[in-house]
Amino acid sequence: MAHPVQLSLQDATSPIMEELITFHDHAFMAMSLISFLVLYALALTLTTKLTNTNITDAQEMETIWTILPAVILILIALPSLRVLYLTDEVNDPSLTIKSIGHQWYWTYEYTDYGGLIFNSYMLPPLFLKPGDLRLLEVDNRVVLPIEAPVRMMITSQDVLHSWTIPTLGLKTDAVPGRLNQTVFTATRPGVYYGQCSEICGANHSFMPIVADLIPLKIFEMGPVFTL
């Protein structure tokens, strides 16, 4: 998860997050180069005497500043389209879980395990243990296997929500009357935190998500839920 004063993205826990970090670095490099060139041209303009004020035509320059931005946009767009395709790619999932957003908690349904359903509420400060994270701990965590494709079916019971876990590279809107899906494969066990990322009312800030990722062999032994 994120650390205090952290400037970079969180460590990747899924292949799609690794792709997003790579694209972020690629786009940041392009934007840094553009910013440097613009600042250099601006500094050059401010420190150079205007000796060529009578120039009315410069077709070479016009050609360059028309073609160069188009090339830069293409170089940014192609990796972006690749990542977009990967995020929408749906392979044969090993597990399907339904997540339903409410004001202001989440409901999880394990349809592959006899229709197991439970709610996940934020823990009030009075119930926190030493080492727990304020505004991020829940009473019931969603338990997921690693090294297996998991499909999350996400919807909402009332208003717009968004099921988000940054370290997994997941952010899917929960829309009333609509069932969205996202497929991911976690690569590392651990406890990972997220929050509702769509303003959904007065207690929007008190709607955390906690995913407990465990090895596939342990998960296959039977549901391991903190109920």
Swiss-Prot record:
Cellular component annotations (GO), alphabetically ordered: mitochondrial inner membrane; mitochondrion; respiratory chain complex IV
Record's keyword annotation contains Chloroplast: no
Highest taxon above the source species: Eukaryota
Cofactor note: Binds a dinuclear copper A center per subunit.
Subcellular location field: Mitochondrion inner membrane
Record-linked SUPFAM superfamilies: Cupredoxins, Cytochrome c oxidase subunit II-like, transmembrane region
Binding, Cu cation A1: H161, C196, C200, M207
Topological relation to the membrane, as annotated: Multi-pass membrane protein
CC cofactor: Cu cation
Spans traversing the lipid bilayer: 15-45, 60-87
Protein keywords: Copper, Electron transport, Magnesium, Membrane, Metal-binding, Mitochondrion, Mitochondrion inner membrane, Respiratory chain, Translocase, Transmembrane, Transmembrane helix, Transport
Pfam families (UniProt xref): COX2 (PF00116), COX2_TM (PF02790)
Stretches of the chain found on the membrane's Mitochondrial intermembrane side: 1-14, 88-227
InterPro entries reported for this sequence: CcO_II, CcO_II-like_C, CcO_II_C, Copper_CuA, Cupredoxin, Cyt_c_oxidase_su2, Cyt_c_oxidase_su2_TM_dom, Cyt_c_oxidase_su2_TM_sf
Subunit text: Component of the cytochrome c oxidase (complex IV, CIV), a multisubunit enzyme composed of 14 subunits. The complex is composed of a catalytic core of 3 subunits MT-CO1, MT-CO2 and MT-CO3, encoded in the mitochondrial DNA, and 11 supernumerary subunits COX4I, COX5A, COX5B, COX6A, COX6B, COX6C, COX7A, COX7B, COX7C, COX8 and NDUFA4, which are encoded in the nuclear genome.
Role description: Component of the cytochrome c oxidase, the last enzyme in the mitochondrial electron transport chain which drives oxidative phosphorylation. The respiratory chain contains 3 multisubunit complexes succinate dehydrogenase (complex II, CII), ubiquinol-cytochrome c oxidoreductase (cytochrome b-c1 complex, complex III, CIII) and cytochrome c oxidase (complex IV, CIV), that cooperate to transfer electrons derived from NADH and succinate to molecular oxygen, creating an electrochemical gradient over the inner membrane that drives transmembrane transport and the ATP synthase.
Name by which UniProt lists this protein: Cytochrome c oxidase subunit 2
